[in-house]
Amino acid sequence: MRKIIHIDMDCYFAAVEMRDFPEYRGKPLAVGGSRVQRGVISTCNYEARKFGVRSAMATGYALKLCPNLILVPGRMQVYKEVSQQIRAIFSRYTELIEPLSLDEAYLDVSDCKLFKGSATLIAEAIRRDILAETGLTASAGVAPIKFLAKVASDLNKPNGQCVIPPDEVPEFVKSLSLRKIPGVGKVTAEKLSSLGLNTCADVQAYPKQELIARFGKFGAVLVERAHGIDERGISVSRERKSVGVETTLAQDIYTLEQCQQVMPGLIQELSSRLVRSAKGRQIHKQVVKLKFNDFKQTTIEHRSDEVSVVMFYELLSQAMARQEGRGIRLLGVSVGLAETKDTLSPLMVRETKQLDFVF
């Protein structure tokens, strides 16, 4: 039986800001956006959350909920440096580390001999080390499988931990809300609820083949999770699956021509990010994303093994066909990256005379 720990830093970006600027402590604080330009909240502290402010919320709406909200720009380089400190702490306990982002990771401590192999005590020690060396708090979940470790890390936040022993897994999952399962978002949860499925116990009692027929591969995964099954191991070399760039516009725009004026800057930035991040990997698709002023969004993609600037503009035209009179508040472009085993050649770009962008 494996011993998996999921470590999740508490309101990470905001916590770093409060550590470095004590005057922010005890006040509602959010990282991202500003009072004069539209944007999206990256994260916020617990004082801000009391007002209903949440990550990925539009800055303007967050300010309506909390007029005294302090907004600060992100300092990504600092967050990356602190994240490296935290990962160095992880490596004292195990080499099996799967970073999910700058502020969370899975650790497999099954073979760790410290604390007589107690995953509970190992998690406590990691959290103590993080606090002592970075001044930041972390929460932890301990379980025999990955998805339950992630669920558990959220149960005693902030600065706490939760342990789900192997013999308690069957009973624990019965009452677990399906919304807690990774991959079950608002829309999927509503579809499941319409079938009378709200907890893992509901899924356990539902015909498996019918779920698979309705939801495909995800239906099969859902059945496994509902029975407390997750055979995924720790992936120590997670590959980046995409590279993209997007911008939240200062004002809503409404026409294709206005969107086309935004595209050159996005494509140029995407070019720079590909050079830094793609490492010669093959692409397999191009994507254009629009978010409207009702906060709904649409994406259009095209399968391709080379980047075409012209195709981005064609995808933009297709996405605009879904506008339905709504204003556009965000525009983004991205490419999907093939797995390393599928890499055949460095990224190729089809150049055009009309658009002088070199990838």
UniProtKB/Swiss-Prot annotation:
Cofactor note: Binds 2 magnesium ions per subunit.
GO BP annotation list: DNA-templated DNA replication; error-prone translesion synthesis; SOS response
Domain annotation UmuC: ranges: 4-185
Site (Substrate discrimination): 13
Positions with a binding annotation for Mg(2+): 8, 103
Chief place where the protein resides: cytoplasm
Keywords: Cytoplasm, DNA damage, DNA repair, DNA replication, DNA-binding, DNA-directed DNA polymerase, Magnesium, Metal-binding, Mutator protein, Nucleotidyltransferase, Transferase
Gene3D superfamilies assigned to the protein according to its UniProt record, in alphabetical order: 3.30.70.270, 3.40.1170.60, 5' to 3' exonuclease, C-terminal subdomain (1.10.150.20), DNA polymerase, Y-family, little finger domain (3.30.1490.100)
One Pfam family, short name: IMS
Co-factor(s): Mg(2+)
Matches recorded under InterPro entries: DNA/RNA_pol_sf (IPR043502), DNA_pol_Y-fam_lit_finger_sf (IPR036775), DNA_pol_Y-fam_little_finger (IPR017961), DNA_polymerase-Y (IPR050116), DNApol_IV (IPR022880), IMS_HHH_1 (IPR053848), Rev_trsase/Diguanyl_cyclase (IPR043128), UmuC (IPR001126)
Places the protein is found: Cytoplasm
Active site: residue positions: 104
EC number: 2.7.7.7
Highest taxon in the source lineage: Bacteria
Enzymatic reactions: DNA(n) + a 2'-deoxyribonucleoside 5'-triphosphate = DNA(n+1) + diphosphate
A cellular-component GO term for this protein: cytosol
GO molecular function, one term: DNA-directed DNA polymerase activity
Assembly: Monomer.
Family of the protein in this entry: Belongs to the DNA polymerase type-Y family.
Function: Poorly processive, error-prone DNA polymerase involved in untargeted mutagenesis. Copies undamaged DNA at stalled replication forks, which arise in vivo from mismatched or misaligned primer ends. These misaligned primers can be extended by PolIV. Exhibits no 3'-5' exonuclease (proofreading) activity. May be involved in translesional synthesis, in conjunction with the beta clamp from PolIII.
UniProt protein name: DNA polymerase IV
Species of origin: Shewanella sp. (strain MR-4)
Gene field: dinB
